[in-house]
């Protein structure tokens, strides 16, 4: 059994016994999940521009909504999202995102999006060329707002 799953099971068993979550163990499960799963499957891109070009060329992203923005703005928006230094608060939230929302390669062997990437693409897609709205959407989604599942899951994807 993967160590992050073992730790998550321990968190759940502890909760069932005591009614309290072992948050230290949960944080360790998140850390191990990234080390043993996400980072291993992550496809590295040199920068946001390279990532966008690859995902459009390979038919993962719709190009039409991205063409409403210049690449400098898109890269700046990615930097803004990453500047929040977002960390998943629990193993369950991280695994739900990477199992259900993050874009993966068609064969499932590579993870193509991180949380911040999905946020930026969703914001760009919904803003339809309005840079100020895209910026506000990234800020809202990185701090509190979560769009409904179909929107978060499908925005910008082919």
Which ranges hold each PLM region?
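Extended catalytic cores of very large enzyme megasubunits
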Residues: 1-158
């Amino acid at each position: 059994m993967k160590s992050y799953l073992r730790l998550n099971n321990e968190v759940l068993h502890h909760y069932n016994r005591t009614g309290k979550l072992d948050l230290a163990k949960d944080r360790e499960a998140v850390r191990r999940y990234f080390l043993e799963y996400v980072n291993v499957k992550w496809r590295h891109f040199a920068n946001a521009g390279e990532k966008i070009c690859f995902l459009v060329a390979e038919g993962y992203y719709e190009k039409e909504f991205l063409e409403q923005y210049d690449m400098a703005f898109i890269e700046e928006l990615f930097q803004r999202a990453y500047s929040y230094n977002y960390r998943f608060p629990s193993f369950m939230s991280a695994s739900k995102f990477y199992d259900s929302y993050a874009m993966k390669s068609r064969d499932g062997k590579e993870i193509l999006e991180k949380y911040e990437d999905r946020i930026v693409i969703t914001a760009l897609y919904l803003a339809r060329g309005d840079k100020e709205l895209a910026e506000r959407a990234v800020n809202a989604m990185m701090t509190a707002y979560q769009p409904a599942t179909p929107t978060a899951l499908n925005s910008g994807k082919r």
